[in-house]
Amino acid sequence: MISFSEATRFTPEKYEETRVWCKEHGHPLPKYLLYPRTKGFVSTVQHLRQAEHVKAVYDICIAYQHRDIFMAAPDMLHTFILGKLTERHRYRFHAHVRRFELRDLPETDVELAKWLEQRWLEKGEWLAEQKERWSKGQKQS
C-alpha cells in the first residue's frame, strides 16, 4: 500500500496555499513539499497495526532534476515514451528510503499525525541538501 500524504500534485499555486495554511495554523512549512494530509495516514497505520504480517512503514522521498531545474519532474507521457531519461534527457533522480518499525510509531492519532509532520520536515531538509549537492556537482547521499 502506498500513501501519498500530500494528496495532490505540487504546483507553485498549491505551495502558496500550503504556506498560507501553515502560517494561519501555526505549522512549520516543509521545503519543496506540500503540508501532509494526516488523516488517511493515521487511519491506515492504526488499521495496519492489527495485521500480523505488517511490520514496518517505509518513508520514500524522491529528488529529481531536469537539466538545472531542481524538482522538475518528467510528466507521465515523457516517462513512458522517452527511454533513458537520465542519459539522453538529462534528468537526475535519487530516492531516499527509510524503514520505521510499526511497533515504534506513536500510538495515539495526534502523536501519529505529529510523527508524519516531522517526517515531512525531514524530507524537506533532505531535498534542500540534495539541491545544494547537485548545484555543486556532488554525488547524492
Segments the model singles out, each with a brief description of its role:
Residues 2-110:
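A cross-family acyltransferase "interaction/gating" segment
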Residues 87-141:
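Pan-eukaryotic secretory-pathway lumenal catalytic ectodomains of glycan-active enzymes
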